[in-house]
Amino acid sequence: DYISGYMLADSIYCWFRRCENITFDISNNHRKYYSYGVNLIGSSHGDGAKMADMPLLMANEAPSLWAKTKYRYVYLHHIHHKQTTKFQSGKDYQGVTVEYLRSPSGSDAWHHRNGYVGAKKAIEAFIHSKDYGQIARLTHLF
């Protein structure tokens, strides 16, 4: 899974390498963070750290981005069904939305054996305003 993902990212990177307004991070970091205006966006495959640990990991791994942003999101991808949890005010963290996204992949033998069947296949995208956080969601069901 990691090798296939890296090879896909590297292929896309090679195709768009001369485009000045497209950037890529194809490092092997398990969690990646990006800022866009007042947004801090984290991403991970979702098979590593627990969902509840993501806000503090974000704050510790990207402290300068954390300090400069107002809206914070972590998008996880490993789960093949829809789950959403909102982390608001708390003792150790506040204001981070952590969300598992649907998968466009079908059920293979492992998913079938473990009962992960029947989930809707989908790709999800988000539009973030530089000033107002996430302002739209797009979902394409297969």
Where in the sequence are the language-model features?
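Conserved beta-sheet core of the metallophosphoesterase superfamily
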Residues: 6, 13-23, 40-142
